Amino acid sequence: MKNMLLMSGSKYKDTAYLVHTLPWLAQFLADYKGKKVAFVPYAGVRRSFDEYETAVKNALQSLELEIVSVHRGKQHRDIIEQADVIAIGGGNTFCLLKQMYEHDLLDAIRAKVNSGTPYFGWSAGANVAGSSIMTTNDMPITYPPSFNALNLFPHQINPHFISGKMQGHNGESREERLEEFLIVNPQSLVYAMPEGTALHIQGEQATVLGAQDILCFSEKMQLDTKAVNSTFNY
């Protein structure tokens, strides 16, 4: 059974890096102390893979996990196949997906997660768990072979969702950008995840975690609000 924790971001309000995720992760990984976590650092454009691995190790130290970045393997895919848990960090989603294709990780991750290996990811790492990365907020600074992602959660995800416009901002709001996507892709569902929220996926059900509701947009921007602590079939 699929077991995934998809988190909107690595910070919430003024919390330190990944601190707000620790209670969720402690429960999610309660049976995995001492186990090997394959970490995918490809989204971290402004820091090296070594630096990203160290940052995540330090932030999650209390969970007593063996975190190993995939770049440590002769073949990156080897680390995925040896892992007890898979984690994908945030950053630029286009860079992330491009390198996942280059290192042939998509099928390996998909197979592991579908067979029960826990998966957690934040921001871009949540994005790529969905059907495609077409509702990311990131600039397309590089071009993956396809926008198609892992499709473990068979819908679109928009992390870091903020409703409306900031004063003085004359560009499109997030709702307007998602409306554009749904005009072109009217059969899709988009799960907009505000800061400090997460989806816990168990099999074919999802539970909303955090301090805010998650919004599900469909054709013509019809809204289905998923309340905090609610569980629904997706």
From Swiss-Prot:
Keywords: Cytoplasm, Dipeptidase, Hydrolase, Protease, Serine protease
Primary site of residence: cytoplasm
Protein's GO biological process: proteolysis
Keyword Hydrolase in record: yes
Enzyme superclass (EC): hydrolase
EC number(s) recorded for this UniProt protein: 3.4.13.21
Gene3D superfamilies reported for this sequence: 3.40.50.880
UniProt catalytic activity: Dipeptidase E catalyzes the hydrolysis of dipeptides Asp-|-Xaa. It does not act on peptides with N-terminal Glu, Asn or Gln, nor does it cleave isoaspartyl peptides
GO CC, alphabetical: cytoplasm
Active site: 123, 138, 160
Signal peptide coordinates: none
Gene Ontology molecular function: dipeptidase activity; serine-type peptidase activity
Residues in coiled coil: none
Location in or out of the cell: Cytoplasm
InterPro entries: Class_I_gatase-like, Peptidase_S51, Peptidase_S51_dipeptidase-E
Keyword Cytoplasm annotated: yes
UniProt-listed Pfam families: Peptidase_S51
Superkingdom assignment: Bacteria
PANTHER family named in the record: ALPHA-ASPARTYL DIPEPTIDASE, PROTEASE S51 ALPHA-ASPARTYL DIPEPTIDASE
Cited function: Hydrolyzes dipeptides containing N-terminal aspartate residues. May play a role in allowing the cell to use peptide aspartate to spare carbon otherwise required for the synthesis of the aspartate family of amino acids.
Family: Belongs to the peptidase S51 family.
Protein name: Peptidase E
